[in-house]
Design a protein with these regions (language model features):
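Extracellular/secretory pathway and lumenal proteins
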Residues: 11-12, 29-31, 70, 92
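Immediate post-signal-peptide N-terminus of mature secreted/exported proteins
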Residues: 21-64, 117-122
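Compact alpha-helical subdomains of small soluble proteins
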Residues: 67-122
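Bacterial Sec-dependent N-terminal signal peptides
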Residues: 1-5
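Bacterial N-terminal signal peptides
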Residues: 6-14
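Residues at the start of alpha-helices and the adjacent loop-to-helix junctions
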Residues: 13-15, 58, 80, 113
Length: 122
């Protein structure tokens, strides 16, 4: 009985450890991929967009929005590509969180592309 319990415990440990280690590896990998500069730019872009909605557009705010959107677009594209290529989205423990990050980045990228396509930003 004791031998059977020890074998079961060893097997369970062997099965559970790689997933835990993989989740930690994915967390570290995603942490490296997420750029603080990109997050700061996204925050500034959202703040400027909110100001335009609340106060109305001014040439200065529109110019700032366009400048930030042009700088933000390649960074978001790069992060999205790297996150998708990492394979961490398939991880059972991290997959949902990473899918949320990808969706958020895709939404931010769509807004930035929409902004840069406007005639005021050309």
């Amino acid at each position: 009985m004791l031998v059977r319990f020890a074998c079961c415990a060893t097997l369970a440990g062997a099965l559970l450890m790689p997933q835990g280690a993989r989740a930690e590896g994915c967390a570290a990998q995603i942490s490296k991929l997420m750029s603080k500069d990109t997050e700061k730019l996204t925050t500034r872009y959202n703040r400027i967009t909110r100001q335009i909605q609340e106060r109305g557009s001014s040439p200065r705010l529109v110019a700032e929005e366009c400048r930030i959107a042009r700088a933000l677009t390649p960074r978001l594209q790069g992060q999205l590509t790297a996150i998708k290529e990492s394979g961490c989205i398939k991880d059972p423990q991290m997959g949902n969180m990473i899918a949320d990050i990808v969706r958020g980045h895709e939404d931010d990228l769509a807004m930035a592309l929409k902004t840069t396509a406007r005639s005021e930003c050309r």
